[in-house]
Swiss-Prot record:
Species of provenance: Kluyveromyces lactis (strain ATCC 8585 / CBS 2359 / DSM 70799 / NBRC 1267 / NRRL Y-1140 / WM37) (Yeast)
Gene field: CMD1
Additional remarks: This protein has three functional calcium-binding sites.
Binding site for Ca(2+) 2: 57, 59, 61, 68
Span of domain EF-hand: 8-43, 44-79, 81-116, 120-147
Binding site for Ca(2+) 1: 21, 23, 25, 27, 32
Function: Calmodulin mediates the control of a large number of enzymes, ion channels and other proteins by Ca(2+). Among the enzymes to be stimulated by the calmodulin-Ca(2+) complex are a number of protein kinases and phosphatases.
Protein name (Swiss-Prot/TrEMBL): Calmodulin
Binding site for Ca(2+) 3: 94, 96, 98, 105
Cross-referenced InterPro entries: CALM/Myosin/TropC-like (IPR050230), EF-hand-dom_pair (IPR011992), EF_Hand_1_Ca_BS (IPR018247), EF_hand_dom (IPR002048)
Length: 147
């Protein structure tokens, strides 16, 4: 559950959780979840909070215990790390910082470094995510890497 969290993170989460656990019951209401997450620097949408509640409130009591909250925060931080890594990888290719990378440059990298792909494989991948402009934005890049 919280094996990938540091003691410092757990303490920070416990402090934030306790601020909203007004009656010291060891749980917070579903409506307070988004506020707690925002106080910790995350920015979940209402839909994301609803999805998270469906996943972690398995007993349907509309309350989140600290252990459930830790598991949730651990997962959220992992997702944020992945998003940050993706953004950093994109920036490597986005030389001029305009939010776009050339499909030709990306093709060169994918066919020459790491697990080398063939021209045909790269062309197929680019065809699936590209809008035909010859450039790839961050969303298309994410879609490409998830293939």
């Amino acid at each position: 559950m919280s094996q990938n969290l540091t003691e410092e993170q757990i303490a920070e989460f416990k402090e934030a959780f306790a601020l909203f656990d007004k009656d010291n019951s060891g749980s917070i209401s579903a409506s307070e979840l988004a506020t707690v997450m925002r106080s910790l620097g995350l920015s979940p949408s209402e839909a994301e909070v609803a999805d998270l509640m469906n996943e972690i409130d398995v007993d349907g009591n509309h309350a989140i215990e600290f252990s459930e909250f830790l598991a949730l925060m651990s997962r959220q931080l992992k997702c944020n790390d992945s998003e940050q890594e993706l953004l950093e990888a994109f920036k490597v290719f986005d030389k001029n910082g305009d939010g776009l990378i050339s499909a030709a440059e990306l093709k060169h990298v994918l066919t020459s470094i790491g697990e080398k792909l063939t021209d045909a494989e790269v062309d197929e991948m680019l065809r699936e995510v590209s809008d035909g402009s010859g450039e790839i934005n961050i969303k298309q890049f994410a879609a490409l890497l998830s293939k």
